[in-house]
Swiss-Prot record:
<keyword id="KW-0812">Transmembrane</keyword>
<dbReference type="GO" id="GO:0016413">
    <property type="term" value="F:O-acetyltransferase activity"/>
</dbReference>
<feature type="transmembrane region" description="Helical">
    <location>
        <begin position="324"/>
        <end position="344"/>
    </location>
</feature>
<feature type="transmembrane region" description="Helical">
    <location>
        <begin position="140"/>
        <end position="160"/>
    </location>
</feature>
<keyword id="KW-1133">Transmembrane helix</keyword>
<feature type="transmembrane region" description="Helical">
    <location>
        <begin position="98"/>
        <end position="118"/>
    </location>
</feature>
<feature type="transmembrane region" description="Helical">
    <location>
        <begin position="164"/>
        <end position="184"/>
    </location>
</feature>
<comment type="function">
    <text>Thought to be an acetyltransferase that modifies the fucose of the nod factor.</text>
</comment>
<keyword id="KW-0472">Membrane</keyword>
<comment type="similarity">
    <text>Belongs to the acyltransferase 3 family.</text>
</comment>
<keyword id="KW-1003">Cell membrane</keyword>
<keyword id="KW-0808">Transferase</keyword>
<dbReference type="Pfam" id="PF01757">
    <property type="entry name" value="Acyl_transf_3"/>
</dbReference>
<dbReference type="GO" id="GO:0005886">
    <property type="term" value="C:plasma membrane"/>
</dbReference>
<feature type="transmembrane region" description="Helical">
    <location>
        <begin position="253"/>
        <end position="273"/>
    </location>
</feature>
<dbReference type="InterPro" id="IPR053490">
    <property type="entry name" value="Nod_factor_Fuc_AcT"/>
</dbReference>
<feature type="transmembrane region" description="Helical">
    <location>
        <begin position="62"/>
        <end position="82"/>
    </location>
</feature>
Length: 373
């Protein structure tokens, strides 16, 4: 989701000139996933606002079963090059500049806007607590991706044993009895980051077994995902079970969560690849891949800010279901339009682009600045 690294996989779609052989099939998948993130939050914060009914919504469930795990798996896959080729200091430093710097900017913006409209003014302690909540909680996925990157980078120092150690770490982290802050969400997504990273390695078993019987696996995983979907409930979400096993029932929910997410993610990824093969030449597919898929960090930051500020709006009874759906549609489109406008403007403002968007300025702008200097 949050990586601008070229994918190593080939043959899933054509790449136009000037893209440096970037595999747009992954960008297409990321574009669809960030759209699902926005839709999922629209369901939670608008359609079902004020109730807990969204936990049982089949639409919410079908999205949350796989969208963040798959995002994390793609991030691990695309981060493989940076993890293996760059030094620890360089890799972590670049990832911090790419992820944490724009996140801090947007968290500060959210906190400033909320503080400006909330009266009376809070104490300094409450103010700092609110700021820390924005920094850690609002964009938890960024922290999960950043921490996962660091963990994998450290574990790769074990050379030949690193694959086995990374696999063991996925299990150890997933079942660690820790529930502090966003730790449950890290425990939930880290194994998928590891899986994505391992799939990027030239181990040989992917081509030998999985790809040879791909469609058999797809059918079996589709059946498994459907069964898990039927059993998925409120306590199956990592937000509620905290990925913590303390009795037989909690073990069942955690196992169902990981099994359902794994099966649904695999089926969804294969479906997106097949869809890309069929429609990659269309304008809609190119928009999803190039405009949305290559702007997922900015879209995630913008939608996070919008939905955090939605806490300031109270919907009355006049907001019936039809009105909410209409407003949600308009807001979803507005988020995309605003993000695209910010991207277009910020990329022309030099290093402001790194602070706001998390991406370098346009190459032409960098060249002109170097000539001036």
């Amino acid at each position: 989701m949050l990586d601008n690294i070229r994918a190593g996989a080939k043959g899933r779609g054509s790449c136009p000139a000037g893209t440096n052989n970037r595999d747009l099939s992954f960008d297409f998948a990321k574009g669809i996933l960030i759209t699902l993130v926005i839709i999922g939050h629209l369901l939670q914060y608008l359609i079902y606002q004020g109730t807990d009914a969204f936990w049982l919504s089949p639409y919410f469930k079908s999205i949350y079963m796989f969208h963040m795990p798959l995002f994390m798996a793609i991030s691990g896959y695309l981060s493989s090059g940076a993890i293996l080729r760059k030094s620890f200091t360089q890799g972590v430093g670049e990832r911090a500049m790419q992820l944490l710097l724009p996140m801090l900017f947007w968290c500060t913006l959210i906190w400033t806007l909320k503080s400006a409209v909330i009266f009376p003014m809070k104490s300094l302690t409450d103010t700092l607590l609110d700021l820390s909540t924005e920094v850690i909680g609002t964009y938890w996925f960024i922290w999960a991706a950043f921490i996962s990157f660091i963990l994998i980078r450290v574990l790769t120092t074990f050379n030949r044993l690193s694959i086995w150690i990374i696999s063991a770490s996925a299990i150890a982290v997933a079942f660690a009895p820790i529930t502090l802050s966003i730790t449950p969400l890290l425990k939930y997504t880290y194994p998928f980051y590891c899986l994505g990273f391992l799939f990027a390695q030239p181990i040989g078993w992917q081509n030998g077994v999985i790809w040879r019987y791909k469609w058999i696996f797809v059918v079996l995983l589709s059946i498994a995902a459907f069964i898990c979907f039927l059993g998925w409930g409120k306590e199956t979400y990592a937000y509620n079970n905290l990925v913590l096993i303390h009795d037989e029932q909690s073990a069942k929910q955690v196992f169902l969560m990981f099994s359902g997410s794994l099966a649904a993610s695999a089926v969804a990824m294969q479906s997106m690849f097949q869809c890309w093969r069929l429609v990659y030449s269309t304008r809609v597919a190119r928009f999803v891949a190039v405009q949305l898929g290559q702007s997922t960090l900015l879209l995630y930051l913008v939608q996070g800010a919008v939905f955090r500020l939605m806490d300031l709006i109270q919907f009355g009874e006049v907001w019936n279901l039809t009105t909410r759906i209409t407003f949600a549609t308009v807001l979803g489109v507005a988020i995309v339009v605003i993000a695209m406008a910010i991207r277009s403007i910020a990329r022309n403002l030099g290093y402001v682009s790194r602070i706001v968007v998390g991406a370098p300025p346009r190459p032409s702008l960098l060249k002109s600045q170097s000539v001036i200097n």
